[in-house]
Amino acid sequence: RDRRQRQMCIRDSLPPERWPQLQGLAVATGPGGFTGTRLTVVMARTLAQQLDCPLLGVSSYALMAPRLERQLPQAMQGEPFWITQELPRRGVVGGQYRITAGQVHELSLPTLLPQGASPQPAVEVQLDVEADVARLLQLLQRSHAAGAAMPWAEVLPIYPTSPVGQV
């Protein structure tokens, strides 16, 4: 039943007769909820493979990095900074970024930080789905215009913590 609902949602949003017109797909790779991240990345990979079209995967933190950097004091902008998120009962997830000439450089992928770690400067995750989706589509357009290959097989979800505890 859930699979059928997802298929209908995809077909309603993008009818199959328009699929050949796709020039590329894009997906946020996380971090995010385990099930949601896994399902969206797998769905995007499957569609890209079956439609033989490029797939751009970008971490959720990299998508929000340009807007979160603006919260830092002017003197710190352009320097490396951390994006962090406290996970109840798990710890703090953090990734390190630097914005130069409008480009996001992901210096450290989001990962579970050692207990007690407090990287600085740091900005707390702030969700803005509309802004992040717009940025993701903008990055897809730029990558496509630049002729980037964007193979689907290289797009993997980011899991900074295990859904089954310590592994």
What are these regions (language model features)?
Residues 56-167:
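Oxyanion-binding and handling regions
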Residues 11-24:
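Phosphate/pyrophosphate-binding loops at sites that engage ATP/ADP/AMP, CoA/4′-phosphopantetheine
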Residues 6, 22, 78-81:
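Local beta-strand N-terminus motif with an aromatic residue
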Residues 24-60:
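DPxDG-like acidic metal-binding loop motif
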Residues 1-10:
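Single conserved hydrophobic/aromatic residue that forms the stacking wall/gate
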Residues 21-27, 121-123:
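Glycine/charged-rich beta-loop-alpha catalytic/anionic-binding loops adjacent to active sites
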Residues 9, 26, 82:
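Conserved beta-strand segments that form the floor/walls of ligand-binding pockets within enzyme
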